[in-house]
Regions:
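Membrane-interface "cap" regions at the ends of multi-pass membrane proteins
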Residues: 1-60, 64-69, 82, 86, ...
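Extracellular loop-to-transmembrane helix junctions
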Residues: 33-37, 47, 57-158, 271-276, ...
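Hydrophobic alpha-helical segments and their helix-loop junctions in multi-pass secondary transporters
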Residues: 187-221, 284-289, 404-421, 479-484
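Hydrophobic, membrane-embedded alpha-helices of multi-pass small-molecule transporters
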Residues: 37-56, 61, 162-165, 219-280, ...
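TM-loop-TM module centered on a large, flexible mid-protein loop between adjacent transmembrane helices
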Residues: 103-105, 110, 142-147, 217-223, ...
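C-terminal membrane-solvent junction of multi-pass transporters and transport-like membrane proteins
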Residues: 184, 353-364, 404-455, 491-494
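Membrane-interface loop-to-helix entry segments
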Residues: 154-213, 268-272, 393-406, 436-439, ...
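A generic transmembrane alpha-helix motif of multi-pass inner-membrane proteins
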Residues: 195, 203, 391, 395-403, ...
Length: 533
């Protein structure tokens, strides 16, 4: 027999779980959030969310390693990224959630899978925050060629200031986040379009750059498409995966978006054009305008190009745009992890303090926790400023692939339940169905193998999983009892052990809402219910 929380302050996690008065057993995850994002903001977030440090900074070193073949690699990974996003889009129309694919993993595979996917996704964005802060610090030091003041600023100090300011802005409101991302994305898009316009002009009219005429002859004169061999070209794949990290952000924003059924499909359908124009198109132009050897590790290739054409002021302006891109990525990462941690906290998979939501609908504690890890980047920049970006980029890539795998697997399980008559698919559907999901899984497995061949950084990154996996196991057994206690009172839970697992149905009758659930009463009811798989 349960005790009223007023009489016994030592109530269990499940006793404190308030059952939502709705037929959506996961609606509790959305409590406290505001519908503060409109179509205008979401459209721009969908277009610009993944245009960040991976493209603006990482492309320089990738071109050095892979040469012109990098454009093909961007196209291939972009194709799989689009399949992943379409699968996520169908899941969103099934049930919009700020918990995104972590919430879907919970629904279709249970709490253990949600725990793993959630914390790996958090690790991804936490490391991305470090990469973005590092990139901005590198970008700022670039201005030292114009003013000694910037050259004298330590890289770690720039990273520290960037993290503090971005965290502070994220704590204000979702509406401010939406406005910041709208303008950040607009600046990035206009900058890339400007680069493409100037680049195409040089290409069409054969205007020399550093005394060399642009065109296909540049590729032939510099050892063709595989200047360093096939393997070096293939092992840059994990860096390109990092460049696409963020395309899944549209899932996190869905829980705070108005008119989801109309806005989400429209936003996702723009992605294929974004990939073709901004990613593949930009890299193709970079390869045709200058030899791949002209690009540098610690400098944006777009800045390198504008510096080479010699138009006064264009290179510094592009460098400011690049800083904006990195700030946008950092801003989006803090937004996303705050919502994911809130979803996990509600389910018991994250510390209870991560469920705190401010009056303005901001998950303050989750954002601050990610910000603290972002400060780890300050330490990394202090000790190894030269290697900081590459180290965290590879770790973040593993987290991105885990997120994509969770989306594909959740969509696959969702379609299986549709086939059993338990759900009805929306009109907006992922092309290829379960075949596309399997193709994505095979692709991700191949990327992991290629990452292992990238010695030493890629090899050591995968070796670090020997530390991460035991930590996840320890973490799960630490929170398992609390997670399962909460899950007992949530209808539609599909976990395997050791709690009830009534499969979700299209419609179910919901009893009159009660403030608290009597666990003793549930125990008696559960004896007559079939157990989960």
């Amino acid at each position: 027999m349960s005790t009223s929380p007023n009489k016994n302050p030592q109530t269990s996690a499940a006793d404190q779980y308030t059952k939502p008065p709705t037929d959506d057993p996961f609606a509790h995850e959305q409590e406290g959030f505001h519908k503060g994002l409109g179509a205008r903001q979401l459209q721009m977030i969908a277009i610009g969310s993944a245009i960040g440090t991976g493209l603006f900074l990482g492309t320089g070193s990738r071109l050095q390693d892979a040469g012109p073949m990098l454009a093909v690699i961007y196209a291939v990974i972009g194709f799989f990224g689009y399949l992943i996003l379409r699968a996520l889009g169908e899941l969103i129309l099934h049930r919009p959630s700020s918990g995104s694919f972590v919430s879907y993993t919970r629904e279709f595979y249970g709490e253990k899978a949600a725990f793993v996917s959630g914390w790996l996704y958090w690790l991804n964005w936490a490391m991305t925050a470090v990469a973005d802060a590092t990139a901005i610090a590198i970008y700022i030091s670039w201005f030292g060629r114009y003013n000694q003041f910037f050259a004298d600023i330590p890289q770690w100090l720039s990273a520290f200031i960037v993290v503090i300011v971005t965290v502070a802005l994220n704590l204000i409101s979702v509406k401010l986040f939406g406005e910041l991302e709208f303008w950040f994305a607009l600046i990035k898009i206009l900058a890339l379009l400007s680069f493409m316009a100037v680049g195409i002009w040089h290409l069409v009219f054969g205007e020399p750059i550093n005394g060399v005429t642009p065109g296909l002859s540049l590729i032939a004169a510099n050892d063709g498409f595989f200047p360093n061999g096939i393997l070096p070209a293939l092992i840059v794949v994990q860096g390109v995966v990092f460049a696409y990290a963020g395309i899944e952000l549209v899932g996190t924003t869905s829980g705070e978006t108005k008119n989801v059924e109309k806005v989400i499909p429209r936003a996702i359908n723009t992605v294929i054009w974004r990939i073709a124009i901004f990613y593949v198109g930009s890299v193709v132009l970079l390869c045709l305008l200058m030899p791949y050897t002209a690009y540098k590790d610690a400098e944006s290739p777009f800045v390198t190009f504008f510096d080479a054409i010699g138009i006064d002021g264009t290179a510094p302006i592009m460098q400011l745009v690049v800083i904006t891109a990195a700030a946008s990525s950092l801003n989006a990462g803090l937004y996303s992890t705050g919502r994911i941690l809130h979803s996990m906290g509600v389910a018991g998979s994250a510390p209870k303090f991560t469920t705190k939501v401010s009056r303005s609908g901001v998950p303050v504690a989750g954002i601050l926790l990610t910000g603290v890890i972002g400060l780890f980047g300050v330490v990394l920049n202090f000790f190894v400023p030269e290697q900081a970006f590459e180290v965290v980029l590879n770790i973040a890539s593993v987290g991105t692939m885990a997120s994509w795998a969770a989306i594909a697997m959740s969509h696959q399980k969702y379609l299986k339940l549709v086939g059993e008559g338990k759900y009805k698919r929306p009109n907006y559907r992922a092309p290829g169905g379960r075949f596309s999901d399997w193709a994505v899984m095979v692709f991700l497995a191949v990327v992991l193998v290629l990452m292992a061949l990238d010695y030493p950084v890629g090899t050591y990154t995968l070796a670090s999983l020997l530390l991460v996996i035991p930590l996840l196991i320890i973490g799960w057994y630490t929170v398992r009892d609390r997670v399962n206690e909460i899950a007992r009172v949530r209808e539609g839970y599909t976990g395997s052990v050791p709690v009830i697992a009534a499969r979700p149905v299209v419609k179910k009758l919901v009893p009159e809402p009660r403030t608290h659930i009597d666990l003793g009463e549930l125990d008696a009811e559960d004896e007559d219910k079939p157990k989960g798989n």
